[in-house]
Amino acid sequence: MIQPQTYLNVADNSGARKLMCIRIIGASNRRYAHIGDVIVAVIKEAIPNTPLERSEVIRAVIVRTCKELKRNNGTIIRYDDNAAVVIDQEGNPKGTRVFGAIPRELRQLNFTKIVSLAPEVL
């Protein structure tokens, strides 16, 4: 469950290291975002000499949350951190690599490019 002011790790090589959620895309008064939701975030920590800079406002899709994800078959998935992948306006990832495990629910939400870059799909 990601809400505004939540810090997230970045799970790609776009140049950002930490993000802070400032808005959840969707309904005007959505309180929480879950895996697969698109958020508006500000970069709080970035690698020097990369295209993304600190205090830049970007869009990102959530790929891991500490809150459990319950599937229809009864299995529950929980990750150790909150993480997101930086995307552009069309939904394509800005980085060329994705780090860590990615849930297969992202494929159903049309983030197939992120799923194809991931080393492991759970």
Curated annotation (Swiss-Prot):
Can you cite a GO biological process for this protein? translation
User: Function of this protein?
Assistant: Binds to 23S rRNA.
User: Could you tell me the keywords of this UniProt record?
Assistant: Chloroplast, Plastid, Ribonucleoprotein, Ribosomal protein, RNA-binding, rRNA-binding
Top-level taxon? Eukaryota
- Which Pfam family, an example, fits this chain? Ribosomal_L14
Q: What are the annotated GO cellular component locations?
A: chloroplast; cytosolic large ribosomal subunit
- What is the name listed in the Swiss-Prot or TrEMBL entry for this protein? Large ribosomal subunit protein uL14c
PANTHER family according to UniProt: 50S/60S RIBOSOMAL PROTEIN L14/L23, LARGE RIBOSOMAL SUBUNIT PROTEIN UL14M
An example molecular function term from Gene Ontology annotations = large ribosomal subunit rRNA binding
Subunit field text: Part of the 50S ribosomal subunit.
List, alphabetically, the InterPro entries matched.
Ribosomal_uL14, Ribosomal_uL14_bac-type, Ribosomal_uL14_CS, Ribosomal_uL14_sf
Q: Which family does it belong to?
A: Belongs to the universal ribosomal protein uL14 family.
The protein's location, in the record's own words, is: Plastid, Chloroplast
Give the organism the record lists. Answer: Capsella bursa-pastoris
